[in-house]
Amino acid sequence: MSTTPPAPAAQPAQQAPTGPVTAYLPQGGFARAVATRLAGDGDVVIPVDQGLVSAYIPYADRAVLIADPDQSGLREDLDTLSFTRGMPSLGLELFPTELRCGPLVVPGRSACYRCYDRRRRQHGYRPLPPEVASEHGPLEQAYAHHHVLLGAGLISLALQALDTPGPQEQAAESADDVAPIGGQVWTIDLVSGITTCSPTVAVDRCETCSGRYEGRRDGLPALAALLPERRGEVA
């Protein structure tokens, strides 16, 4: 006598994310600890220890790179991803004596990382020499549990600034104008405990963000540069 097989158990419907989706891009042990603490149910964590490949980064509303000091290559790749997709981005670095979070890059409304790096060098900062970085790789920093908490707090603060428009931004939106958003850099001195926040001033004629105040800016021109034979379709 044949029997009817039991019906398969009902699978719960996958819920859509209720808030912005964040792509966390960790490089190194400290970064993985911070990303694990921050990532929510709808967020994605993509390790970038071997490099940041934009094709591997799924859809997200914003991207956060957490890395060891002086990872300029990763930061520039993040800038490219950010401006191509029109997606806000942020970086967190652990230095021997400080945590640095920023700049908060908002394509079309803020300066980019390249501007920040140039301004920092103008003020005397000297990163790790490229030949040392290529020979020895990233200089991974030792960290304690409270460093993870502080780093997660800085990222949360930056994302809150992104999600909560200020009075100046609301006034600009009502006047049908585009107000600058982002560009902030937050730092915590791990010796004194002093926390600071400073803006990033864009460099004139920057190749990445010189059109940052154009309200209609999007990623199509950058895409067209990769597909010259189809440039007329997106002009």
Segment roles from a protein language model:
Residues 33, 150-158:
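Short amphipathic alpha-helical face segments that pack within enzyme cores
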Residues 45, 89, 185-187:
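Conserved beta-strand scaffold positions in the cores of enzyme catalytic domains, especially
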Residues 36-59:
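A short, well-structured beta->alpha microelement
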